[in-house]
Amino acid sequence: MASELAMSSSDLPTSPLAMEYVNDFDLMKFEVKKEPVEPDRSISQCSRLIAGGSLSSTPMSTPCSSVPPSPSFSAPSPGSGSEQKAHLEDFYWMTGYQQQLNPEALGFSPEDAVEALISSSHQLQSFDGYARGQQFGSAAGAGGAMAGEEMGSAAAVVSAVIAAAAAQNGAPHHHHHHHHHHPAGHHHHHAAPGAQSNGASAGHPGHMHLDERFSDEQLVNMSVRELNRQLRGVSKEEVIRLKQKRRTLKNRGYAQSCRYKRVQQRHVLEGEKTQLMQQVDHLKQEISRLVRERDAYKEKYEKLISSGFRENGSSSDNNPSSPEFFM
């Protein structure tokens, strides 16, 4: 079939009308007769592809069935344009092999292609060498510019897939380094509580020193200005703690003072109450005494009146000047 497609330079149309006629002609009406594939070359090709693992697991497309028949490398007939025929055969081979390089034609994702390429690195190396050889061979001829472009795009696809596979292979190493760094981080985290405990234990002597430096009485009696002057150079936490302690002590002193004042006032009031009750009792006694005196004086008065009336009645006849005489 490749030999039938290979045309000599004299058979190629040159006029625009002929080219337009060829373009308008429907070539799909004709059946293309396929030549039988050489058994030894197809078997070697299949064995080479299967050795590294199948590129696709779908039953609709297999490496052996999708590989086009290899070109015939028979000796060119004299006078038929051997150089251009070789270029046309190479172009036909590369356009057919493009199905293997296109992942969409095979029906799998780029991730599947990367996994397949990782599992078959040897196959990729051999195919890369073969593609480069075909690219150099097609670029050597004068009429192989189109084949060189197709092969260049194929080589670009292969190199891109190889780079993706290398990047994916390098990813586990990166994670491995992260796993190596994690234990160190854990050690740091485990060491941090110890450092905090050491800092806390180191802070306790500071607490004891400040507590010994300022007694409760000094904190209560010391003014705020003097306390701030004494606490220069001390950490903020210690200053807050001491001021809170001073406030607590002063509040406690205020509460005790108020309680004492209330007790004292209660005692005073109770004493005054007792004194007043004593005065009331004394006044009651005075009242009773005065009542007795009054009664005595009244009785005496009544006696005097009665005795005086009798005396006046006996002497009224002899005394005409008395009031009863004129009546």
From Swiss-Prot:
Gene Ontology CC annotations of this record: nucleus
Keywords assigned: Activator, DNA-binding, Nucleus, Repressor, Transcription, Transcription regulation
Compartments, as annotated in UniProt: Nucleus
Span list, region Leucine-zipper: 269-290
Keyword Nucleus assigned: yes
Basic motif, as annotated region: 241-266
One Pfam family matching this protein: bZIP_Maf
Region span, Disordered: 54-84, 167-209, 308-327
Record has Transcription regulation as a keyword: yes
Ranges where the bZIP domain occurs: 241-304
Family label: Belongs to the bZIP family. Maf subfamily.
Function as written in the Swiss-Prot or TrEMBL entry: Acts as a transcriptional activator or repressor.
Protein name, UniProt field: Transcription factor Maf
Species the sequence originates in: Danio rerio
